[in-house]
């Protein structure tokens, strides 16, 4: 699968994450048929144009934390605006907020 079709598949999956839920990079990789390639999901989301409608902000790391340094504040604000709360360590409770695919 080429990057273009792989990225399209990743974007399609991410669009299914409902408002108020999150998924992990690894979870998206598994659903995209590339288990163990969480970084590829990160590369795909990083490639999105600014005006994209893909809810990239709903994808976080396996520890329930935001991985992006450059957009950390924006991602945090977007998630909070959807009703997702963070604990004192800036971690999201995956048992409560993780999307069950």
Describe the function of each predicted region.
Residues 1-101:
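Nucleic acid-binding interface residues in structured DNA/RNA-binding domains
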């Amino acid at each position: 699968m080429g990057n273009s079709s792989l990225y399209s598949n990743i974007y399609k999956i991410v669009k299914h994450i409902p408002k108020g839920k999150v998924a992990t990079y690894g979870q998206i990789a598994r659903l995209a048929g590339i288990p163990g390639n969480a970084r590829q999901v990160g590369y795909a989301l990083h490639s999105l144009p600014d005006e994209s409608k893909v809810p990239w902000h709903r994808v976080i790391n396996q520890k329930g934390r935001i991985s992006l340094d450059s957009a950390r504040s924006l991602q945090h604000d977007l998630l909070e605006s959807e009703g997702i709360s963070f604990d004192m360590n800036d971690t999201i409770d995956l048992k409560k907020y993780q999307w069950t695919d």
